[in-house]
Amino acid sequence: MTYLLNERICALFRSNWQHTLTYWSVFFSFGLCVAFLGPTILDLRCQTQSTLQEITLVFFSQQFFLFLGSTIGGFFSKTLVSSLSSLAVSTLIISVVFAIIPLCRELLMLAFAMAVSGLAMGTIDTISNLQLVKIYQKDSTVFLQALHFFVGLGALVSPLIADPFLSDTSCVIGNSSVNTTSLEDLRNKLAGRHVHNVSNVHLHTDGEVVTNVSYAFWIMAIINLPVPIAIFVLVYRERLFMCGSDPSRRLLDGDVLAIKPRGTSILAEDTGQKETSNSHADLFSCCLLGKAHSFPLSFFGIHVLGGLVLFFSDGIVGSYTGFVYTYAVAPPMNLPHKTAGYLTCIFWAAITTGRLSAIPLSYRFKPVRLLIVSQVGVIVTVLLLLIFSNSSVFLFIGTCCLGLFISSIFPCMLALTEDILEYKGCATTVLVTSAGMGEMVLQVLVGSVMHSRGSFSFLLCGMIFGCLGFTFFTFLYFVQQSHKSYTEALPGNSPVERHEENGIKTCSAAVLNSWDAPEHKTSLDP
């Protein structure tokens, strides 16, 4: 069975390899944008000749517009041409932003550039997740894990590119200088996504600017440039230009036809098209109040609960990357600044490794099982960090374990929720938006609590967020059972039949027709 499963997934990938690789490369661009701001923020402060308090506003600018981009990204995904066009424009914008950042000599110009990049990142986040889910459906977990692996890969590559060009001493030469050690400590402190409590840090704002960080941004712009080119090639290959194609072509039309064999009968083609229409025609109908009466409460409950799970899980990721350094250098840890600076890198490396290792695990285990292990692992890890709060060694071990456990929650949750809703509604848009909101809101909350209650509250907040996430996941399980019973009881609205060939469930009617084994087809209980 495992061999046949791998064979089917490989067949799906071969039929959609260009789409899939394009979406993965797009998320690499997303990862580049995620991590470049922290290491380069001091050089950008010098470039704009602003204070440290003022330059940290660009963090909020990028994060807020990333949230907005995640929200509006779903509205560009109704057709294949609009989806690919949005991705091409967004990735091209990222390259342009990288190229013009060295030219932004004013703080407002830099904040505007970060806002534009955040908007592009949010659009990429929603559309890429949505397209992979719609292509692979039941098998999307494997490909979503790989998709989010490329985020971590980009987040690791970006600081490595920037590091050789960062200033070792004060990059604004004034009447006096800031020693190298202080600048390195500040850069380590700014390695997170958000920065607080910097009002007591004073650096020169007037004087001669000496920085080579421009080369880092231009290199990243060049590295990212093949991504929009690849998308335009894909658009050309699919013949989606407006002058020679139907602009209303649905998102899955090309994908379903791509995996349909040449010998498929007309009846099978009609069946596949009917299923596609029923499953995806009303992608955003759950967001329209006029049609709300046609859905049960459990339908909306699944959206809300799934969003809350990712709200807290991504909130943990954001707050941990933003404040683990502050926690490590404060009592009772009192780690050296340079040593504490490695924690954020270790956390991102663990997330990247976890997503890579989750790819083969997704072949063997259902998303719900991976989610249970991940959620429990997060809670246990944070609990152990609380118990061994005086151990600097366990802080590094716990950081690594936390990254490994939390890495696969987002892709598994996305695949599970879409599967429950049978790929109807706007689950992907809601989940991606909720994750972005959690990352933005909970970072501010943790920063405020740490400022008023001390560094120990950092882990306590993580424990509370982890428990809340697992609680909402438990509620989701019971609501899912209620939703399943409701949909099965509706007259004339039985769930889409799932077939099994040689013990393997197919993900769509088109895929079913691509397997030449007409015998032993039986329906399966989802």
Swiss-Prot record:
UniProt membrane topology term: Multi-pass membrane protein
Manganese in keyword set: no
Protein name listed in UniProt: Major facilitator superfamily domain-containing protein 4A
Single GO cellular component term: membrane
Superkingdom: Eukaryota
GO terms assigned for molecular function: transmembrane transporter activity
Family that this chain belongs to: Belongs to the major facilitator superfamily.
Keyword tRNA processing: no
UniProt xrefs under InterPro entries: MFS, MFS_trans_sf
Keywords (A to Z) from UniProt: Membrane, Transmembrane, Transmembrane helix, Transport
Protein source organism: Danio rerio
SUPFAM superfamilies for the chain: MFS general substrate transporter (SSF103473)
Subcellular localization: Membrane
Entry's transmembrane regions: 21-41, 55-75, 84-104, 107-127, 142-162, 215-235, 297-317, 341-361, 377-397, 401-421, 430-450, 458-478
